């Protein structure tokens, strides 16, 4: 209460910041006359002078900001016939300061970005503009390139599916690069799997503007980017677990209010935390069905894991809500955008469990080769900024995790949209009927309606109901997302009815004409509250752009997921007190507040989850940075591994001595020299004469073995020149490093999966994870030292004579195989084994095998 009064008297921090920016806007406006009087060539010349001054460090970016913004505004007027409003200049300054600009729908965020983009591209270190999809990346780059090209700046676009390294390199070397968050992240991971510096496509991470920043840095923060490879593990367990899961019966959790109450059934589902707990009865039943004595024995660990995932697949994941089945494949539906996430798969065997559930071909389990979260990728940039229409609800998270401040930019024209209170019905069916009646009422007078649904399944239900009512409409969901921009752009036409899942065409404007304005503008109907208030605000924000009229309202029921899981007891009590009959609804601020409190509960759960993921990923991130930094050193053409190999060889020999129980301080006569010679030969291919090293003390023995390995190695390397030696050492070392890092990531995945159980032992799982992961990393370092020396010692070079011999042997083998083919006489109608493509009877079968042809 006191805080609210203080804000009214003194103004908020946001208000103070906006006032500061408005003072600078006046200075930029004062320059408008100066630049509008210049010819095109004079304007370009002025910009070039500023760029030269900046590159020669005579001025800073802040010194020239006013002039650059004024020039960009003038160029935009001349090329695009669009003039930046004052509030757009403020948005540009907020982005330039490394903050988040919250700008409502239709305020021209794409044009705002051109201001800081041009200013930060002037130092030639590159600027990245990140969008949520390929369509927006291509559209924004194409539209705004007229401004950039006028000023002599180059523009590149990174699109998914176009993996030509040379083209990508050109795009990244442009002054300005547009692309999606996934492509930027994956290119970073791919670059750190390359074997030459010249093969890398990205350059330094300088300045980035993230469009729809809330979607990318918050909604997708729980989804790491993973490059994976096959594990070659058997897939039978998934089918077996699926059969067992179908026979287990779902029960109810124990009631904490009733003493000694127990969970019923074979397993209990906790929808709030999206987890499943198998009861004692369920464990006994599963053991019987699997035919094992103890499901939780070490040898059955994979079985119990498969069963957990199968139960999740059947009880927590719904077809057409969380995933769709298309072309015999299970494809994830992004819960925030409603789009299909093709190419993305659930990890830890969950995707395979869904494939078993749906009876489609189970694809091989994958192993992580490289991974990173968006949180850690975007924190690599020297300066990170973002823009969106909805960020204030997550301002705390932006501040805590990304050190980003959210500044709300005033609208150019006041918002005229009317947001009505929610209507709540007892059942989902009543709600559906009420929505259809409301659509009919609006449709009769011609007011366009956009209906937002939470899933593909619900959008299909509305589609069928509207078909029954003979109301013409368009459907936009993940199944027909190809026409997204086209469908959304038409949603503001008179009489239009559009059903859309959460995707609702972000970045595409819904324009309305004067006739629709007279009818009250676009009517937004939300059919379910999302877990995040921000997603609801985005749906509302589709109407009322640039001062247009509009209307929005949410229709809810007590059977909606959010209210059922998180908040319906209080609301149900209110409805019972008011004696609400079937088909009736309630509309009150009290209920709307209760719904918002339920959403806040979920948001804080998700925030904790993202924070938790980041805390764990920060541990892995430090290790990732260390490995990638070392990898970059290896790729440096001037880096010589000679000293590193000498040092690693010493550690390698110490490891071999430890293996055969030869320790410092032991008596030379008691050392098992025969075993040592055997191990050295097995691990390095180097033969040592026992008599040469018998009776030596520990240090003399170690030196002798090291010298022998070094002599062998130098002798082998003497057949090639120094440059070739360096290249071979680097390539082999990189291969060993990548293999060791892959194995390390696999071990880290296993560690992360089970670490939560340490909490039952009164230990902090995060502290335990840090300790264990440090130990794993030290194992990685030791493995790298030993494996690299082992590989370098064992490798052998072929002379030209060896190559010729191999080729001759190969040829003889092929001829022998062919002879064998002919000895097993084929049937007359079978294809002829000579490879002609004809039947045997029409070819070699005519007059016996024509051996002369193959001599």
From Swiss-Prot:
Biological classification of the source: Bacteria, Pseudomonadati, Campylobacterota, Epsilonproteobacteria, Campylobacterales
Binding site for ATP: 88, 106-110, 509
Cited Pfam families: P-loop_SecA (PF21090), SEC-C (PF02810), SecA_DEAD (PF07517), SecA_PP_bind (PF01043), SecA_SW (PF07516)
Stretches the record annotates as Disordered: 815-837
Protein name per UniProt: Protein translocase subunit SecA
Gene: secA
Organism: Campylobacter fetus subsp. fetus (strain 82-40)
Cofactor(s) annotated in UniProt: Zn(2+)
Record field: catalytic activity: ATP + H2O + cellular proteinSide 1 = ADP + phosphate + cellular proteinSide 2
SMART domains named among the record's database cross-references: SecA_DEAD (SM00957), SecA_PP_bind (SM00958)
PANTHER family: CHLOROPLAST PROTEIN-TRANSPORTING ATPASE, SECA INNER MEMBRANE COMPONENT OF SEC PROTEIN SECRETION SYSTEM
Catalytic activity, EC: 7.4.2.8
CDD domains reported for this sequence: DEXDc_SecA, SF2_C_secA
Homology family: Belongs to the SecA family.
GO molecular function, one term: protein-exporting ATPase activity
HAMAP family: SecA
One cellular-component annotation, GO: cell envelope Sec protein transport complex
